[in-house]
Amino acid sequence: TSTLSWLDEITMEELERNPY
């Protein structure tokens, strides 16, 4: 789940910037 940690953070940031 360590990999998901940074992935989740990046996804959250991307969603905040470009909410599809």
Swiss-Prot record:
Its EC number is 1.14.-.-. The keyword Metal-binding applies. Its cofactor is heme. Induction: By 2-ethoxyphenol. It is an enzyme of class 1 (oxidoreductase). GO terms for molecular function: metal ion binding; monooxygenase activity. Keywords: Heme, Iron, Metal-binding, Monooxygenase, Oxidoreductase. It comes from the Bacteria. P450-RRI catalyzes the O-dealkylation of 2-ethoxyphenol and 2-methoxyphenol to produce catechol. The cytochrome binds other ortho-substituted phenols, including 2-ethoxyphenol, 2-methylphenol and 2-chlorophenol. Belongs to the cytochrome P450 family. This is Cytochrome P450-RR1.
